[in-house]
Amino acid sequence: MYLSPQEKDKLLIYLAAQLARDRRQRGLKLNYPEAVAYLSAAVLEGAREGKTVAQLMSEGLTWLTREDVMPGIPEMIPEIQVEATFPDGTKLVTLHHPIR
């Protein structure tokens, strides 16, 4: 099976996000790469489900809280930008201060 570089990136994000979901479910606080992967994968999945950019930007502010991550992580992530494929094309989704 051949995967393009973009498909490989999405697969790695999914894998890292799954690890982050598992750790969060066990009550562990997420570190920087886990939090970024968790949020990025949620954007990609939301786009795949047909949500709009505006919906994802709004919902993205509720996916993780300060209690879900290690101390200092919210300040390390002032924004996340994810290029996601929507039914009408590829768009850039930006989450500003996604961990509150």
Curated annotation (Swiss-Prot):
<dbReference type="GO" id="GO:0005737">
    <property type="term" value="C:cytoplasm"/>
</dbReference>
<dbReference type="GO" id="GO:0043419">
    <property type="term" value="P:urea catabolic process"/>
</dbReference>
<keyword id="KW-0963">Cytoplasm</keyword>
<dbReference type="InterPro" id="IPR002026">
    <property type="entry name" value="Urease_gamma/gamma-beta_su"/>
</dbReference>
<dbReference type="InterPro" id="IPR012010">
    <property type="entry name" value="Urease_gamma"/>
</dbReference>
<dbReference type="Pfam" id="PF00547">
    <property type="entry name" value="Urease_gamma"/>
</dbReference>
<comment type="pathway">
    <text>Nitrogen metabolism; urea degradation; CO(2) and NH(3) from urea (urease route): step 1/1.</text>
</comment>
<keyword id="KW-0378">Hydrolase</keyword>
<comment type="subunit">
    <text>Heterotrimer of UreA (gamma), UreB (beta) and UreC (alpha) subunits. Three heterotrimers associate to form the active enzyme.</text>
</comment>
<protein>
    <recommendedName>
        <fullName>Urease subunit gamma</fullName>
        <ecNumber>3.5.1.5</ecNumber>
    </recommendedName>
</protein>
<comment type="similarity">
    <text>Belongs to the urease gamma subunit family.</text>
</comment>
<dbReference type="InterPro" id="IPR050069">
    <property type="entry name" value="Urease_subunit"/>
</dbReference>
<dbReference type="GO" id="GO:0016151">
    <property type="term" value="F:nickel cation binding"/>
</dbReference>
<dbReference type="InterPro" id="IPR036463">
    <property type="entry name" value="Urease_gamma_sf"/>
</dbReference>
<dbReference type="GO" id="GO:0009039">
    <property type="term" value="F:urease activity"/>
</dbReference>
